[in-house]
């Protein structure tokens, strides 16, 4: 799959997600994940779609598949906090929210 095709599918999933079709967006993003496994942009969008569809456990599974490193997007922790909260895991949700709001080191010019 070309990068342009992947981008087109992401745009379609975004439109579906923001027009009340979160389940359809999740199906599309699951297919995209099968074609390009481990893509962080896809996994974040998939987690958001699952959260909107009320599937917190599936959202958390998508987030758990992300590779965390220094460049991991902060929104992953926000989505994780939301999923954990919905799963009635308040202590873990609090830690994820603290990680989301924690000060980040400035980017060095490179």
Positions of the model-derived regions?
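Alpha-helical segment of the N-proximal tetratricopeptide repeat
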Residues: 5-27
């Amino acid at each position: 799959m070309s990068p342009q095709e992947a981008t087109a599918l992401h745009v379609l999933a975004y439109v579906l997600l923001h027009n009340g079709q979160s389940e359809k967006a999740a199906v599309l993003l699951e297919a995209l994940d099968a074609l390009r496994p481990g893509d962080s942009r896809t996994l974040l969008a998939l987690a958001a779609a699952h959260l909107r569809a009320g599937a917190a456990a599936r959202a958390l599974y998508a987030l758990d598949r992300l590779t965390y490193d220094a460049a991991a997007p902060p929104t992953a922790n926000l989505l994780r906090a939301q999923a954990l909260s919905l799963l009635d895991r308040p202590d873990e949700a609090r830690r994820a929210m603290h990680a989301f709001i924690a000060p980040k080191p400035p980017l060095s010019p490179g």
